[in-house]
Curated annotation (Swiss-Prot):
One of its GO terms (molecular function) is ATP hydrolysis activity. The complex is composed of two ATP-binding proteins (LolD) and two transmembrane proteins (LolC and LolE). This is Lipoprotein-releasing system ATP-binding protein LolD. It comes from Yersinia pseudotuberculosis serotype I (strain IP32953). ATP binds at G43, S44, S45, G46, S47, G48, K49, S50. SMART domains: AAA (SM00382). It is a peripheral membrane protein. Part of the ABC transporter complex LolCDE involved in the translocation of mature outer membrane-directed lipoproteins, from the inner membrane to the periplasmic chaperone, LolA. Responsible for the formation of the LolA-lipoprotein complex in an ATP-dependent manner. It is found in: Cell inner membrane. Its EC number is 7.6.2.-. GO terms for cellular component: plasma membrane. Belongs to the ABC transporter superfamily. Lipoprotein translocase (TC 3.A.1.125) family. SUPFAM superfamilies: P-loop containing nucleoside triphosphate hydrolases. The keyword Repressor does not apply.
Length: 234
């Protein structure tokens, strides 16, 4: 492991204000992710998990505190620089795959490369490689409507990894799948972690799946618990 964290957040706070009323969604959240680490953050709906992920990915800005990615403070980056970082260095997986319905699996996976300026032939070749890595080489010409739920999520995983990111942020990646497909997706994440050295931060309410990660933290009422009391509970 590196001497420096891959990503670090320091005293992150997020407050939503409406008139005289305010809601503190995150309160002084601090932790670090090491290169190649598999980390899960568990918590119930409304605990602040998704908000935290948005801040870590530069999709939203904290009220106070700081996110540092490979030595760069996201607070200091322009919107354009944040977009470039997300496209080139971070991957995202969501509960609902967010695939473009009119494009094939191959075209969906190639999209981040094309946005980043890759030549179409190079983008398609890399997209083919990633679809093969997730077991969908023979489904590359199918559109999302022609794929099962598990297959669509595999396409989304391939898309998240096509730029060889150091870190993938996954928001309830198995929340829309049955148990068999959920198990398959988590097994795949573990395989890709070993094969490519990609770090994964997964937020989930599924305790059994969270146990498969190398480290688990708990989000409770906007605060991060570094001693996980929920894992192992019935």
């Amino acid at each position: 492991m590196s001497n420096h964290p891959l990503l670090q957040c320091i005293n992150l706070c997020k407050r939503y204000q409406e008139g005289q009323l305010h809601t503190d969604v995150l309160r002084n959240v601090s932790f670090a992710i090491e290169p190649g680490e598999l980390m899960a953050i568990v918590g119930s709906s409304g605990s602040g998990k998704s908000t935290l992920l948005h801040l870590l990915g530069g999709l939203d800005s904290p009220t106070s505190g700081e996110v540092i990615y490979q030595g760069r403070s996201l607070n200091q980056l322009s919107s354009t620089a944040k977009a470039e970082l997300r496209n080139r260095e971070l991957g995202f997986i969501y509960q609902f795959h967010h695939l473009l319905p009119d494009f094939t699996a191959l075209e969906n996976v190639a999209m981040p490369l094309l946005i980043g300026g890759s030549k179409p032939a190079e983008a398609q070749e890399k997209a083919h490689e990633m679809l093969a890595a997730v077991g969908l080489a023979k489904r590359s010409k199918h559109r999302p409507s022609e794929l099962s739920g598990g297959e669509r999520q595999r396409v989304a995983i391939a898309r998240s990894l096509v730029n060889n990111p150091s870190l993938v942020l996954a928001d309830e990646p198995t929340g829309n799948l049955d148990q068999r497909n959920a198990d398959s997706i988590f097994n795949l994440l573990g395989e890709l972690n070993v094969r490519q050295g990609t770090a994964f931060l997964v937020v989930t309410h599924d305790l059994q799946l969270a146990k498969r990660m190398s480290r688990q933290l708990e989000m409770r009422d906007g605060q991060l618990q570094h001693h996980l009391t929920l894992v192992g509970a019935e």
